[in-house]
Amino acid sequence: MKYSMTMKALLLFLLIIMNIVSGCGGQQSADKSKLQVAASFYPMAEFVQAVGGKNVQVTTLVPDGAEPHDWEPSPKDLTRLGRAQVFVYNGLVEPWAEQALEALSERKIIPVEAGRALFTRGGKQDPHVWVSPKKAIVEVQRITEALCEADAKHVDEYKANSRAYIAKLEQLDKQLTEVAQKAPKKVFVTAHAAFGHLAEDYGLRQLSVAGISAEAEPTPGDLQRLIITVKREKVRYVFFETLTDPKIAKLVAQETGAQTAVLDPLEGLDEEGRKQGLNYLKIMEQNIANLQKALNE
């Protein structure tokens, strides 16, 4: 997604607003005893909170239920970012991030591109690194380094929290490794190609209805080829996700006799999910259970 004069106008407006906010005590809602961290979208926010614990106040820019690939910051969102001491973002999902940081350069915000150098797979750039526990561990380690840099007083707590959370990610890694190794099938089908890193890291093969972007629409030819492949591979489940329209995934399932199930790319958590007490770890456990079922039938 390329930004036009609209984005530039927003950034200019942001600078004006930030000057007004600075002179009017606009940060009163922030707890000054805590490190102020802005996170681009849900998984980044959860990783920050897991490491930061009681010593951080996390602002998530992309709201609950929104698709982060489609989301663009408003002037209000950019103002919220301008109040942060640390900004954690994945990379590639947030094409607006670099321009926003450049406009806010005088704020001395510490930027953390948690997914940097992890994106390439199969010669392509794929941002969905957080859905692989192996790469999520790397992201958490980078977030830990940034929090320690920004807040030296609580380094020991950040490192202890990080070790505890990474131990839980390592347990997910172990579970997924066992599922993938023991499964008679190695192919699974998803609504969009959000699980390529997971597939690559665990010796599986992802087939997708749409491309890496959730916005991508498959052509009739793409659909026909996928339907043929699903029948040939005897795939019993077509996975869809919670934040996008499942109609195409359901069409493929209908044409092939497969069932549908959820494989959540963890791009966001809606209000219902929060009410249920869901989080990254619990949703990944559900994903692993659903994958296990699909790969063994």
Question: What are the language-model segments listed below?
Answer:
Residues M1-K2, S22:
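General N-terminal leader/first-domain-start detector
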Residues K2-L11:
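Bacterial N-terminal signal peptides that target proteins for export
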Residues L10-I20:
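Bacterial N-terminal signal peptides
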Residues N19-E297:
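Extracytoplasmic metal-acquisition and chelation regions
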